[in-house]
């Protein structure tokens, strides 16, 4: 790419916004030129607006420190400076739906980390390795919005990234029933232990809205594009419980699964290790070389050892074994703010760029 695409971050001061900024430092295709946040941050430098709330392990990139934060509600002004935006705004769902459409209507593509548009019929919800073909929905969406280049694309919930890739890899064996429990990191709530001390040595057996997302969103990701809309996968039937656990980064899933035709363990592992999709074929900058790794040790995957596999963009599976009630059971692990949030959105933007949906204005 001769000239980098100009990127804006909506909701730049929050945890996911910060993750976008750290991931996009030195990105070969994209450059952060605009940061936008709430009116109370507008007019300050990014460094001032974030203050002591920088939550990343790496220092704040020099290139963004002195950027003046724009008011996210001043859509025309923000849009005029960028080729596309990443959205990580903290608003009500109705407000998010409205503001993301406003940006799209200024002919600015929106790649969103938010859940507001995940069930909008003509908005693709994509894990690029699994369902990059769903980006073709954008043509239908542009007709509705009356745009030529503006659109919205979203990534699914962080909780599903630890097991949905395995379901996709095993598609030919017909996953039929899935029982999953997720053990979710506190960064998924935008928190650290410093600002959520009651999570130390604690487990909370409830995360609002998360179980429904974890049961339904995989069916859209695994669905097929027919006549300008997504036909949801009818199987597997998924039931889920979601727990908040005292871990900073990394969502773990304990999964039981039945198949239409029961494969061997060796077949399942082979499918995991060989699974790849558009990001690997197109050699996108953020794509993991190997999307899913299988770990044969009894005590893996572990958050401390494995959460940063492939820079947090890969998924780790382990403990695959036969079960007395189900065909198999296994453990999955993914990085919830990299693959599950900002990193997954960056990979979507790379895929959209490679496919020609995102271009310089």
Role assignments for model-derived ranges:
Residues 1-206, 237, 309, 315-316, ...:
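N-terminal Rossmann-like NAD(P) cofactor-binding subdomain of oxidoreductases
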Residues 187-361:
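Charged docking surfaces used in two-component/phosphorelay signaling
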């Amino acid at each position: 790419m001769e000239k980098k695409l100009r990127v804006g971050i909506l909701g730049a001061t929050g945890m996911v916004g910060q993750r976008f900024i750290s991931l996009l430092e030195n990105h070969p295709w994209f450059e952060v030129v605009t940061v936008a946040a709430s009116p109370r941050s507008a007019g300050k430098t990014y460094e001032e607006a974030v203050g002591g709330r920088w939550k990343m392990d790496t220092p704040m990139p020099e290139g963004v420190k002195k950027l003046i934060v724009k008011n996210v509600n001043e859509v025309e002004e923000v849009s005029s400076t960028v080729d596309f935006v990443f959205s990580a705004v903290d608003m009500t769902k109705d407000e998010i739906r409205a503001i993301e459409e406003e940006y799209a209507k200024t002919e600015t593509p929106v790649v969103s980390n938010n859940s507001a548009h995940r069930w909008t019929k003509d908005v693709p919800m994509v894990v690029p390795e699994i369902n990059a073909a769903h980006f073709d929905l954008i043509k239908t969406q542009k007709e509705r919005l009356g745009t030529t280049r503006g659109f919205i694309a979203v990534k699914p919930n962080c909780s599903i990234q630890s097991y949905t890739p395995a379901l996709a890899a095993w598609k030919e064996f017909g996953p039929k029933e899935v029982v999953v429990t997720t053990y979710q990191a506190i960064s998924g709530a935008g928190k650290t232990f410093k600002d959520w001390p009651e999570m130390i040595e604690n487990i909370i057996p409830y995360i609002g809205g998360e179980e429904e997302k974890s049961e339904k969103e995989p069916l859209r990701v695994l669905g097929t594009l027919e006549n300008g809309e997504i036909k949801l996968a009818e199987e597997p039937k998924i039931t889920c419980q979601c727990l908040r656990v005292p871990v900073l980064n990394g969502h773990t899933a304990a999964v039981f699964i039945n198949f239409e035709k029961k494969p061997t363990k060796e077949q399942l592992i082979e499918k995991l290790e060989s699974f790849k999709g558009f990001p690997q074929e197109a050699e996108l900058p953020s794509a993991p070389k190997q999307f899913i790794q299988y770990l044969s040790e009894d005590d893996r995957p572990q958050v401390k050892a494995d959460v940063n596999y492939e820079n947090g963009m890969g998924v780790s599976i382990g403990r695959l074994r036969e079960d007395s009630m189900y065909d198999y059971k296994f453990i999955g692990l993914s990085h919830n703010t990299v693959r599950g949030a900002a990193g997954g959105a960056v990979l979507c933007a790379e895929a959209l760029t490679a496919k020609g949906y995102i271009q310089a204005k």
